[in-house]
């Protein structure tokens, strides 16, 4: 019997209230909302956040398609979100952003002001939930001292993780020594590093061009970030720190484990090291469990195969609540239990994926 359900990946849509914590000099950086001057009646309605004169999508979502309402998506009514969680059978949701999944500005001062306001807004809203809404904080990574102060504040106000992108942030990849002070403080605070799909590199291309680089800027970035951490032994440097790959599915994990082994095997016995600077490492039997890397899976993936590589102890699942894309799975509990009923996956794995593993990963 499942003792509880922790939804390891949900979202909010930022709203005007998100920026109300930008005071003093920060207030001049507040995002504003704009609409197309000549909307195409053949296309869905659109609107944008305007940040430093540049546009970023501000989604207009369908309640029917997303299975949510504006009150629950934007946390306008925390009680309504909790009521919906009750209907879904969810005890706890862990919340990630929407706008910040793609870096929205090139300017550190604007980035810091927006992230501080977001953290305070979300900390305030989740603080009204009796501990059922937990959240992942957004440090302003271009300034490490500010980042450390921000994650300390966030930990004190209900945050249970730190959002990190798998490609460059502050011009650096996740395994760069620049981030070691962040990882050291996260380890001390017992906050995991949550590598969510998305990109830390600003891109102001039109939305219609997003599909041309979609994988590289979303799932591909997250997977590459995890691989870099393993290759450069970052988990070994911080032996109590947990890392997560969020919303990229889990089918990639067997390939990454295979590719690591093949890469390392081909380097052994060479007279010189690779000009590409690929480090030599020992690859354990379960590279993910050994490195405390947790992965959110999709309930229709080849889970028996994935469990052989990742194990039962490092998989989680999220509904992608608020968003309407291929990752959305509001009924993940029923689907996992149905697979266990057919003996497709072990019942023990269902309990771990739904509750035990996210509880450990997020330190709940």
Describe the role of every protein-language-model region:
Residues 2-5, 15-72, 76-92, 120-128, ...:
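Mid-to-C-terminal alpha-helical segments outside catalytic/metal-binding sites
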Residues 5-7, 13, 92-96, 194-196, ...:
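A structural signal for short, well-ordered beta-strand segments and their strand-loop junctions
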Residues 71-79, 114-116, 120, 172-183:
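Aromatic- and glycine-enriched glycan-recognition loops and surfaces
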Residues 127-134, 139, 145, 151-316:
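Catalytic pocket-lining loop regions of alpha/beta-barrel enzymes
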Residues 10, 320-321:
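Active-site metal-binding loops of divalent metal-dependent hydrolases
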Residues 18-34, 109-114, 147, 179, ...:
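Aromatic- and acidic-residue-enriched segments that line the glycan-binding/catalytic groove
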Residues 62-73, 83-108, 132-140, 160-164:
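Divalent metal-dependent hydrolysis catalytic cores, especially in the metallo-beta-lactamase
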Residues 98, 141, 197-201, 321-324:
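Short glycine-enriched loops at secondary-structure junctions
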């Amino acid at each position: 019997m499942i003792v509880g359900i922790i939804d390891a990946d949900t979202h909010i849509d930022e709203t005007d209230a998100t920026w109300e914590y930008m005071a003093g000099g920060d207030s001049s950086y507040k995002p504003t909302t704009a609409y197309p001057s000549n909307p195409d009646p053949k296309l869905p309605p659109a609107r944008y956040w305007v940040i430093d004169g540049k546009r970023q999508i501000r989604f207009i979502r369908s309640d029917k398609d997303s299975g949510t309402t504006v009150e629950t998506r934007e946390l306008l009514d925390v009680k309504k979100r909790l009521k919906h969680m009750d209907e879904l059978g969810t005890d706890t949701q862990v919340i990630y952003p929407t706008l910040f999944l793609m870096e929205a500005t090139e300017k550190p001062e604007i980035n810091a002001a927006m992230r501080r306001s977001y953290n305070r807004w979300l900390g305030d809203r989740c603080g009204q939930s009796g501990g059922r809404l937990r959240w992942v904080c957004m440090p302003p990574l271009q300034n490490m001292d500010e980042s450390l102060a921000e994650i300390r504040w966030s930990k004190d106000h209900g945050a249970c993780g730190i959002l990190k992108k798998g490609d460059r942030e502050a011009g650096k990849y996740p395994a760069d020594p620049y981030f070691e002070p962040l990882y050291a403080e996260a380890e001390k605070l017992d906050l995991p590093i949550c590598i969510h799909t998305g990109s830390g590199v600003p891109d102001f291309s039109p939305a219609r061009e997003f599909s041309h680089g979609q994988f590289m800027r979303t799932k591909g970035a997250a997977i590459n970030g995890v691989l870099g951490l393993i290759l450069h032994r970052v988990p070994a440097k911080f032996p109590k720190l947990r890392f997560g790959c969020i919303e990229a599915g889990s089918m990639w994990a067997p390939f990454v484990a295979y590719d690591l082994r093949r890469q390392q095997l081909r380097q052994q016995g060479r007279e010189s090291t690779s000009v590409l600077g690929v480090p030599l490492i020992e690859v354990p039997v379960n590279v993910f469990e050994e490195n405390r890397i947790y992965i959110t899976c999709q309930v229709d993936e080849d889970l028996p195969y994935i469990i052989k590589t990742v194990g039962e102890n490092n998989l989680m699942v999220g509904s992608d609540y608020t968003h309407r894309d291929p990752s959305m799975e509001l009924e993940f509990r029923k689907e996992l239990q149905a697979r266990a009923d057919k003996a497709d996956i072990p019942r023990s794995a269902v309990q771990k994926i739904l509750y035990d593993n996210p509880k450990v990963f997020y330190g709940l």
